[in-house]
Amino acid sequence: MAKGIFIVGTDTDIGKTVVTAGLMHVLRSRGYNAVYFKAALSGALEIDNKLIPSDTKLVSDVSKLEEPYENITPYVYRTGVSPHLAARLENNPMDLDIVKEKYVYLKEKYDFIIAEGSGGIVCPLIDDGRGVYTIGNLIKDLNMSVIIVASAGLGTINHTVLTAKYIENLGIKIEGIIINKYEKDLFYDDNIGMIEKITKLPIVAKLKNIKDMNDNEIEAIRIHSEKAFSAENIIKHMEQL
């Protein structure tokens, strides 16, 4: 039976896709049968009249994952807004049964699943008149625990603590926090220490700020993730699905 973890960011564009790509690379490059899953992506690329989920492409390219995009990201939207609104604008509402079918398929095919959210923990996926269904609801339905991706910079204490407390209030287990865009600095280190004290959560890893992303994005992520993560530590924080 597969083991897995759900990656949640404290905000949009916090770098959780880069972190997820790095985690996937470390596992797969060491022979672990790992797969990526993202239920919905908005703001997709359009290449040759076909929508390409950019996050899914990046993770797949970095980790050399060859699973078809439609199996690991079942809902892809062109419009770069929250998935619930993109679904309404493009008349393509999410069907949770399809999302869960894809997830079960991946659980049966792979040994490890790293899932990634859209936006933050409260990002709405569905708003169909019966209530709002968020990333938090999806995590509970998939019965996954989470790792929070946070920055080390200004505002991170507030963002990270609020995210952690909200997740805990949902009854979801938090395995720890990964700090992204980290540099050795008194200010950053004090922020990280304060987050640990207030949340009582471990810092799982710190990923450096990847400054050479534009030159060779894929190779830069691989190199820096190998310094920040170990396969054993990643697996240690996964739970049976």
Curated annotation (Swiss-Prot):
Could you name the Gene Ontology cellular component terms for this entry?
Answer: cytosol
Kindly state which reaction or reactions the protein catalyses: (7R,8S)-7,8-diammoniononanoate + CO2 + ATP = (4R,5S)-dethiobiotin + ADP + phosphate + 3 H(+)
Which cofactor does the UniProt annotation name?
Answer: Mg(2+)
| Annotated positions binding ATP | 13-18, 55, 116-119, 180-181
- Active site (catalytic residues): 38
- What protein does this entry describe? ATP-dependent dethiobiotin synthetase BioD
One biological-process term from Gene Ontology?
Answer: biotin biosynthetic process
Q: What is the annotated role of this protein in its UniProt record?
A: Catalyzes a mechanistically unusual reaction, the ATP-dependent insertion of CO2 between the N7 and N8 nitrogen atoms of 7,8-diaminopelargonic acid (DAPA, also called 7,8-diammoniononanoate) to form a ureido ring.
The record, for Pfam families, names:
AAA_26 (PF13500)
The record's comment on protein family reads: Belongs to the dethiobiotin synthetase family.
Recorded hits in InterPro entries, A to Z, give: DTB_synth_BioD (IPR004472), P-loop_NTPase (IPR027417)
Q: How does it assemble?
A: Homodimer.
GO MF annotation, one: ATP binding
Q: Which residues bind substrate?
A: 42
Q: Which species is the source of this protein?
A: Clostridium kluyveri (strain ATCC 8527 / DSM 555 / NBRC 12016 / NCIMB 10680 / K1)
